[in-house]
Amino acid sequence: MTALENIKKEFITNLLINQNKGVENIQKNLYSYEDYENLLQSAYEVIKNNPDDDITSIRKKMYETSGINEAVNHLIYEMEMAPSLSISYGTKNYQEVINAGKVNQINTSENSIYDLASISKLFTSISILKLASENIIDLSKDITYYDERFHNLKGVTLLSLLTFNTPLITKGRIDEKDISYEESKNRLYNIMVNENFLSTANPYTDLGAMVLKEVISKVTNQNFYDFVKENIIDKANMQKTSIFVNPQDLSYLAPTDNTIVYKNGEFIFRNIPLGTVNDEKAQILGQQANDFAGHAGLFSTSENMAKFAISLMKYDILSEKYLKSMSKNATGRFIEELNSYKQFFGQLCYSKNPNPKATEVYHPLSGTSFAMGGYTGNQFTLDPENNVFAFLGSNRTNNRVANISGFDKSKIKHFPSGKETILIGNKEYINSSTYSSKRDEALRCTLKLSLSYLFLEYYVNTLENEIDLTGTYSRHI
């Protein structure tokens, strides 16, 4: 057995161990030794067949065999699922960005700005966990212990909201048309436990994060965005991450305007001015109040989100104990009557779902990996055990049909390229409602490549070669 083969065996053994860290039995052993061997086969062949190549050349050849170009081309140029896309990915040492499409007639780049939508929840989760790690709050205590304004939530703990374990409901929508800021806030403070919520239903909600945001502000006596900026954004040097986009940067902002949704038997066109967040609750309780709403409302770039990932992996923002607790399954289980799994959530994030078609967290990653998606077309995955990550930014809601719940799907026009359109009036619009499943191939290719780069780093370090493994690379296709 060659040195390379021995190193590959050691590396795969580590991956096998790491996939079972921090997970329940139902989430264990989702990948076998053979699965990992197949996953790394291309990377192994590149290293084996190019012994005299430098690190840059080997990484380039790994990229060329990764399938990323084909997956991104199919998603953006053939299916036209979004006007633009920017994916940052890699290891703690080395990061790449792949860009496709255009933002405001300019080629997408690592500086293109995206509406993070629900990925913003990760900043709320990390904020509450930071306070817990400093013994400022106790996650087992009731919401009302820290904030009596939520008088209907007696008996509801911080942890239960952090883990989507308490269904909530408000008297009237927080984002009702023409609602005032004061009334929207009042409805939030009068939030109640939804006693009629089905135990088999998906427990995902924005409301828990919105309540936790208020608790953090109350406990710290600080505007929530200011807290997040001080404790996360500035620490990670994320200079392009904010609740507002600077006027001079608007040309870099990927628009989400003309978001089309099917509701009550008709298509509704949502006008969203450039610089306004897509989420209406985040508009009212976030931007209009010069604050971060907690569930959505942040803008960022793929380059900034790479900085976010690296800072997390270095434990600059949150301790190892609390970071690796985020992925712990709190909701997932098999439901006999539905013959399927209830969605697996951790702490305002996804945990591994054993069903490979339903999981938001890529199965080859460690058990401490977590992920979160965003309505506007984004996804963030972090593996703090193996130290790899990926952020996918896009604007799939721009001039596209984003939601067709209740629509007659037989009226969708299908093209050989995979593109889908819907006729509204006299004009055909691209259907991007299935974007989250269609983008998975591109996302998983980047995570697979990140693991390949990690294998390369492990190989170099094991041989004790004095090679600089750090660096960045960006490309547009």
Regions found by a protein language model. Give the residues of each.
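Mature, folded catalytic cores of secreted/periplasmic enzymes
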Residues: 72-73, 77, 87-101, 132, ...
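Active-site-proximal loop and beta-strand segments within enzyme catalytic domains
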Residues: 30, 50, 103-206, 222
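Generic anion/oxyanion-binding catalytic loop in active/binding sites
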Residues: 57, 113-114, 150, 201, ...
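Residues at or immediately flanking beta-strands
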Residues: 84-86, 142, 242
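Residue-level preference for non-acidic, small/hydrophobic
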Residues: 72, 87, 121-124, 128, ...
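Short, surface-exposed loop or secondary-structure junction motifs
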Residues: 155-364
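Short, contiguous, well-ordered secondary-structure segments
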Residues: 1, 188-201, 212-216, 416-419, ...
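Catalytic loop of the DD-peptidase/beta-lactamase superfamily, centered on the K-T-G motif
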Residues: 4-99, 229, 270-477
